[in-house]
């Protein structure tokens, strides 16, 4: 969970770059794992987890875009409320 927070904190571009660096690191670890079978199995599990995180990255990006869209809509709603508020006052007067 902590690693995901770190990825979000780094930003979109850096997040992708860091994931690429992690993939390179996995490759270098695989070279070492050839010398010991035990590490090979553990690293295999780690690779699967990292692949899952990479698949989630674009989803998180979409969520951020959706949040930005909601904020824009919220601003529009505020404007429409301001426009609507004088109308009832006019009918009252």
UniProtKB/Swiss-Prot annotation:
Its main location: nucleus. InterPro entries: PRMP3. GO terms for molecular function: DNA binding. Signal peptide: none annotated. Residues 81-93 have a biased composition (Polar residues). Keywords: Chromosome, Developmental protein, Differentiation, DNA condensation, DNA-binding, Nucleosome core, Nucleus, Phosphoprotein, Spermatogenesis. Residues 1-93 are annotated as: Disordered. The modification Phosphoserine is found at residue 85. It is found in: Nucleus; Chromosome. One of its GO terms (cellular component) is nucleus. GO terms for biological process: cell differentiation; chromosome condensation; flagellated sperm motility; spermatogenesis. Residues 37-57 have a biased composition (Acidic residues). Protamines substitute for histones in the chromatin of sperm during the haploid phase of spermatogenesis. They compact sperm DNA into a highly condensed, stable and inactive complex. Belongs to the protamine P3 family. PANTHER family: PROTAMINE-3 (PTHR14317:SF0), SPERM PROTAMINE P3 (PTHR14317). This is Protamine-3. It comes from Bos taurus. The gene is PRM3.
